């Protein structure tokens, strides 16, 4: 079944210590374009997230946002450099004695010096974090796929309906085309009769030859056969479980080409009007497939 490139999905994971929120939005795009925003603290998981997204989205622009919070636990360690602190204290004592400073040396005096107190982020277990984030991302992607599939189903049904309209139009064109040559013969015969004083001298062989040449030039049988084949392929394609947008686009291009040829070969007003209708329906399908994966 056709899959829309437009959709949204949201997933969460939460326990006593960790919270993940994942939001994923997709829109139409000619190729696959995956954009991931996640906190620096878990940036090492980006490639795994990207690979997971690729399993669900074959084409389109993907914007995936990840929020990560630690609950009930500190995410940093505070340490101090004992050796460096000892050196600072010794030098402060030396300064105090040398200049007879009466103030005492306090903890605050020492702590203000660079690199005495160090803030270090705690290292989290990568496998543990991924097992939790994977659940949230997959939950969001499953919901995204459901929404895209539902929208794709509606698009496929609309295209199938338009395929039926196209089939009706091309069958009408085929019906009118069968009488085009005979109409040409009658008009040619009438025109010659008007120009000649004696219609009985019309060269029937030459007339038949001219009609045959016209019939060959104006024949749209091959175009109609190919057009019908493309309609069948299009209807079969839109209900396949695959990335089908580009194939449908190709079929529409081919159908437009056949339609243009039919229009250029025929001067029949009925066929001309039907060609306009066919091109209108093809344009509507072309607009629809811009949003199919």
Curated annotation (Swiss-Prot):
E.C. no: 3.1.26.-
One Pfam family from the record: YicC-like_N
Induction of the gene: Accumulates by 6 hours of growth, expressed for at least 12 hours in sporulation medium (SM) (at protein level). Accumulates independently of Spo0A sporulation response regulator (CD630_12140, Stage 0 sporulation protein A).
Cofactors named for this entry: a divalent metal cation
Segments crossing the lipid bilayer: none
Disulfide bonds: none
Mutant phenotype after disruption: No visible change in biofilm formation (in BHI-S medium), TcdA toxin production (in TY medium) or growth in sporulation medium (SM); increased sporulation in SM but not 70:30 medium. In SM medium, sporulation initiates earlier than in wild-type cells. Higher levels of spo0A transcript and of Spo0A accumulate. Increased transcription of 165 genes (most are in the spo0A regulon), decreased expression of 21 genes. 5-fold increase in expression of the sinRR' operon (CD630_22150-CD630_22140). No change in pathogenicity in Syrian golden hamsters.
Single GO MF annotation: RNA endonuclease activity
A biological process from GO: sporulation resulting in formation of a cellular spore
NCBIfam families documented for this protein: YicC/YloC family endoribonuclease
Role according to the record: Negatively modulates sporulation, probably in response to nutrient conditions. Effects expression of sporulation regulator spo0A in an indirect manner, possibly via repression of the sinRR' operon.
Name this polypeptide is given: Probable endoribonuclease YicC
UniProt organism field: Clostridioides difficile (strain 630)
High-level lineage: Bacteria, Bacillati, Bacillota, Clostridia, Peptostreptococcales
